[in-house]
């Protein structure tokens, strides 16, 4: 009986060790897969669609375009999203703070409006992987790793008060110096700013975007997709 009991205990111990090793291996594999997935997500955009005549800094294309005061119609995003070879497309709307009493942020700082429903540029870099409350509210802002400090968690930007709901990990790109907010909030403060009145003489900010960031499908050639975009989207470059 003692031998049988000892044999059973040994068998149980071996089985436990085997299960433990398997579970540990699976955890390591899952961790590696999550790391690879996050790395893929953080690669940013393959193509940046800008209005013709706007210059883009190639070193910034993967993450965030340089802000320019020229625009594309908002429906360009839908057109681009439907082009063969496009996996994801998300719009951005640029504005900026000014060195005036309407802005508590020190210095002139890039402000980029994003659509969190389609965004794949900012989300993967969020500290903690998510926003406070799980969404980007109309009065919420996300700070790049090197954006100007916000006193008390809130800032006045072009006359409107915003609250910090998230921060980004360092990217080594212009994203680090950028303040992000909801795309419609960015349009609203830009439209109401007396410092930007001349920009909107011929453009409706609520029907405008600054660029479309594009990620191509696996196996698709970015150059071919870019050529198709230029062909199908008048005024794009």
Which sequence ranges carry the predicted segments?
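A conserved hydrophobic position in a structured secondary element of the catalytic/binding core
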Residues: 50-51, 72, 114, 143, ...
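Membrane-interface junctions
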Residues: 3-7, 38, 170, 218
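Hydrophobic, regular-secondary-structure patches
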Residues: 20, 24-108, 136, 227-231, ...
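Short, flexible, solvent-exposed loop/turn segments with mixed acidic/basic and small polar residues
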Residues: 11, 130-132, 199-205
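Hydrophobic secondary-structure segments that place a key small or acidic residue at a functional site
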Residues: 92-95, 104-117, 121-198
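N-terminal Sec/SRP start-transfer signal
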Residues: 1-23
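Short acidic/His/Gly/Ser-rich catalytic and metal-binding motifs that mark active-site loops
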Residues: 55-59, 120, 217
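Mechanotransmission and gating elements of multispan inner-membrane complexes involved in transport
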Residues: 167-237
């Amino acid at each position: 009986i003692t031998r049988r009991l000892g044999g059973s205990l040994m068998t149980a111990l071996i089985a436990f060790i085997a299960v433990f090793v398997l579970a540990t291996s699976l955890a390591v594999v899952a961790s590696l897969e999550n790391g690879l997935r996050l790395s893929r997500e953080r690669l940013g955009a393959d193509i940046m669609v800008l209005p013709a005549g706007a210059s883009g800094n190639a070193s910034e294309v993967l993450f965030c375009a340089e802000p320019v005061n020229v625009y594309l119609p908002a429906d360009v995003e839908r057109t681009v999203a439907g082009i063969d070879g496009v996996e994801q497309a998300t719009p951005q709307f640029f504005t900026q703070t000014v060195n005036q009493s309407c802005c508590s942020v020190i210095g002139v700082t890039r402000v980029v409006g994003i659509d969190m429903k389609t965004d794949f540029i900012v989300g993967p870099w969020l500290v903690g992987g998510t926003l406070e409350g799980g969404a980007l509210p109309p009065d919420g802002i996300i700070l790049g790793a090197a954006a100007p400090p916000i006193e008390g968690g809130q800032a006045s930007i072009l006359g409107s008060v915003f609250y910090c709901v998230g921060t980004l990990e360092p990217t080594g790109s212009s994203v680090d110096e950028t303040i992000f907010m909801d795309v419609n909030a960015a349009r609203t403060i830009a439209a109401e700013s007396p410092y930007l009145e001349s920009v909107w003489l011929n453009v409706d900010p609520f029907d405008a975007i600054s660029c479309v960031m594009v990620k191509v499908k696996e196996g698709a050639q970015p150059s071919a997709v870019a050529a198709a975009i230029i062909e199908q989207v008048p005024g794009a470059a």
